[in-house]
Amino acid sequence: MGLPWYRVHTVVLNDPGRLLSVHIMHTALVAGWAGSMALYELAVFDPSDPVLDPMWRQGMFVIPFMTRLGITNSWGGWSITGGTITNPGLWSYEGVAGAHIVFSGLCFLAAIWHWVYWDLEIFCDERTGKPSLDLPKIFGIHLFLSGVACFGFGAFHVTGLYGPGIWVSDPYGLTGKVQPVNPAWGVEGFDPFVPGGIASHHIAAGTLGILAGLFHLSVRPPQRLYKGLRMGNIETVLSSSIAAVFFAAFVVAGTMWYGSATTPIELFGPTRYQWDQGYFQQEIYRRVSAGLAENQSLSEAWSKIPEKLAFYDYIGNNPAKGGLFRAGSMDNGDGIAVGWLGHPIFRDKEGRELFVRRMPTFFETFPVVLVDGDGIVRADVPFRRAESKYSVEQVGVTVEFYGGELNGVSYSDPATVKKYARRAQLGEIFELDRATLKSDGVFRSSPRGWFTFGHASFALLFFFGHIWHGARTLFRDVFAGIDPDLDAQVEFGAFQKLGDPTTRRQVV
């Protein structure tokens, strides 16, 4: 046929059988990728330390999505929450991966069958004998079926009525587990961080989809609307489908980047805004203050801070710190976290407690500045020592650790104090193993960052695709050069411009 690469999809125009075939093959490719990727991730995933080396630090992409839907066990005998299990059941990580691969194979065979047997009676209009699809009816069928699936997910899977529930955690990502969720029908259901909204919105949207599907199955579109929106043209279906996909991609890019109940931080890592706002730092200080109010010592209060909470309060877990072209997991960047060294408290020679100013998200380097409780600069690590007034040596800064591995240890020599002051810029201080993976020390993003970038990019691309195909279907007559009001029978090839009698071809 000699089609250019950007026109090859015209081969399935007016060929419903092969149009169906290529869509089934696409589903086979997607399901096959998902299953294969899951098996690859399971082969390289280390489940031994869910606190300091969780799935998002290891760069897992599909495991978090399985986990949030209720899969927690592996045929390898481990559970995502730690510990061992003896009977993981069919719906383990490997079971889901295998199901996708089997489904992919069946779709592959179905696609081949429909490609070979493309000329089926069901695709033909009995009045004309030509291939024809009743697109409004097909729209109604798809709307109804997707409504049933949506309702079923919300009413059965999420609520635990028939299914495991979903991943639910506390606001600080410490106690997450899979559990049934009751629908939230009040105003709280509109809070993106309330899991009950997931159940209620799927039930409501599914009900609406079922009703809308039945409507479109039982009511024919008015002729004027049918013609105006080109409802008989398959490119209209393409355009509106692309619109649905890019809209969904923009929405999930937002819920992933800003955080929501659908993207728990235990599975995808914290958001950048939790670092920007000192979210975990405030909670840590609140817990320490509560401990001190109960007459605990500083050491006791800091020792009760969960290592998991302290680890969230570390800039290396901020998804916005990874560069756009830095491939690899977070562990390949700053290393595998081994342990929390403890919270450093700096003091000058007058006994004032000093706080290291933390590095903002979009800085690669930042001056080491220590301020007192009133925000007044008391010490720093100067760029030019000759002009320094607040150097660690001049001010006599010391550091003492509370909680963690260095609990009760203090340092007064300036070199060590400066080392820990620099590290305190990055939040809580952790020992990181950079040797095992040959980590290069340059921060990487988490799957939260990759997902957002990928979906925002494709959403923009698909937005232009929607405009392109929408314009092609709405203005098809203009592009083809056919007057829509032309009633006369037009002989193809008689005119240079189709249907324009002023351009009759001259016989040479």
UniProtKB/Swiss-Prot annotation:
| UniProt similarity note | Belongs to the PsbB/PsbC family. PsbB subfamily.
Give the GO terms filed under biological process for this record: photosynthetic electron transport in photosystem II
The record, for PANTHER family, names: PHOTOSYSTEM II CP43 REACTION CENTER PROTEIN (PTHR33180), PHOTOSYSTEM II CP47 REACTION CENTER PROTEIN (PTHR33180:SF35)
Specify whether DNA repair is a keyword of the entry.
Answer: no
**Membrane topology label:** Multi-pass membrane protein
Q: Where, per UniProt, does this protein localize?
A: Plastid, Chloroplast thylakoid membrane
Does the record's keyword annotation contain Calcium? no
A GO molecular function term, named singly, is:
electron transporter, transferring electrons within the cyclic electron transport pathway of photosynthesis activity
What are the protein's UniProt keywords? Chlorophyll, Chloroplast, Chromophore, Membrane, Photosynthesis, Photosystem II, Plastid, Thylakoid, Transmembrane, Transmembrane helix
Query: Gene for this protein?
Result: psbB
Write down a Pfam family by its short name: PSII
The job of this chain, per UniProt, is described as: One of the components of the core complex of photosystem II (PSII). It binds chlorophyll and helps catalyze the primary light-induced photochemical processes of PSII. PSII is a light-driven water:plastoquinone oxidoreductase, using light energy to abstract electrons from H(2)O, generating O(2) and a proton gradient subsequently used for ATP formation.
The organism's taxonomy opens as: Eukaryota, Viridiplantae, Streptophyta, Embryophyta, Tracheophyta
What does the subunit section of this Swiss-Prot or TrEMBL entry state? Answer: PSII is composed of 1 copy each of membrane proteins PsbA, PsbB, PsbC, PsbD, PsbE, PsbF, PsbH, PsbI, PsbJ, PsbK, PsbL, PsbM, PsbT, PsbX, PsbY, PsbZ, Psb30/Ycf12, at least 3 peripheral proteins of the oxygen-evolving complex and a large number of cofactors. It forms dimeric complexes.
Cofactor detail note: Binds multiple chlorophylls. PSII binds additional chlorophylls, carotenoids and specific lipids.
Transmembrane intervals: 21-36, 101-115, 140-156, 203-218, 237-252, 457-472
Q: What is this protein called?
A: Photosystem II CP47 reaction center protein
Q: Cite the InterPro entries for this sequence.
A: PS_antenna-like, PS_II_antenna-like_sf, PSII_PsbB
| Gene Ontology CC terms, in alphabetical order | chloroplast thylakoid membrane; photosystem II
Major location category of this protein: plastid
